[in-house]
Amino acid sequence: MKKSLILGYGITGKSFANYLTKKKLNFEIYDKCFEGKNFIAFPEYKYLKKYENIYISPGFKLKEYLSETEISSLKFQTDLDIFFKHNNSYKIGVTGTNGKSSFAYYLQQILNQVSSGIIVGNFGNPVLDFLHHKKKYSIIELSSFQLEKLNKSLLDLSVITNISPDHLDFHGNFENYKKAKLKICNNRAKTFFANTNMSLKDFAFEIASSLEKIDSNTSRSLNELPHRLEEVIPGIINDSKSTNSASLLYAINKLNFDGNLIICGDPRKEPKSYEVYGPQQVYIFGMHRNELMEKVKSRRSNIKTFSNLDLVLQDIKKADSKPNILFSPGNSSGKDFKNFEDRGNFFKDKVLEYFSD
């Protein structure tokens, strides 16, 4: 009996399983965090060659299990390979270290005023779950993990918002990360690079105008995604989506911020220390606070560390009952929270607890 193997059982792995189940195909799954029916130990190389197809999730680290020679001798399929083959929409690929989700969200809103589009991919909507959608445009948000494993890009148009060091714990160094990001250019399509002097919203209108007729009837009032420079109450900003130093420093500069900056998260993917200018006070909290103290430098700001957010907000409130606060963690969630949404919602709840009238 022919069988396929799924490597990794996160969001993409589950979508592979659903896809194969609907097609009534036999499969096994390897994920070191799961056990149960259909789950197996990682097969020896000689057995891997016997699978009909091997489907690989974006974050799966093959080098932990196989040599370079073994990896190069096997054929792996991504969910994007399947999507490119079986979905007939016009495919717009979007990548970048920061801003790709916001750009994709703006573009979707604009295109849906004059045509029809849907965001899939790293945005949280696995492409296989939308394999047969009937929209004209697929706006595919692509991470470096997805692009690194992609066999062949069949995008119709590519967009890069920016590239700065990120995920170096996975890619090893900035050059590997950059190389993965730039794989979005290896296609038949034109690639657009965002202009640093243009807002992402204006950039989205520019791209939409290259695809559809955008006129005065097209609303320029677009919704924003949560956890991106989101005002919780006047003077307090939730920027929990900030998962690297580049996004943290961008937020400070954009807001010309000089109040209380709050940082947290796991700094392992940051290649080196960085200087924070502007904020009068910097707070670092959480289980990674000692490591963060090694990375975050500030000659102009006082830096305080606390074990949890409650203690941070209590300290701020002692000095000012209506403070300016920027919560821009600058790191992945690590051991403190499940993800940036979880920590952003936690922050907003705590702000309302301490500072709402």
Task: Show the residue positions of the predicted features.
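Short, basic phosphate-binding NTP loop
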Residues: 1-93, 228, 294, 300, ...
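Nucleotide phosphate-binding/pyrophosphate-handling subdomain across enzymes
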Residues: 3, 15-19, 117, 200-281, ...
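Residue-level signal for inorganic ion chemistry
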Residues: 20, 54, 94, 122, ...
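Short internal beta-strands
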Residues: 28-31, 193-195, 262-264, 279-289
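Active-site regions of enzymes building and remodeling cell-envelope glycoconjugates
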Residues: 36-46, 51, 70-76, 89-90, ...
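Walker A (P-loop) phosphate-binding motif
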Residues: 79-122
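Flexible active-site lid/hinge loop adjacent to a nucleotide/diphosphate
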Residues: 133-200, 335-341
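C-terminal helical cap/extension that packs against the catalytic core
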Residues: 269-324, 357
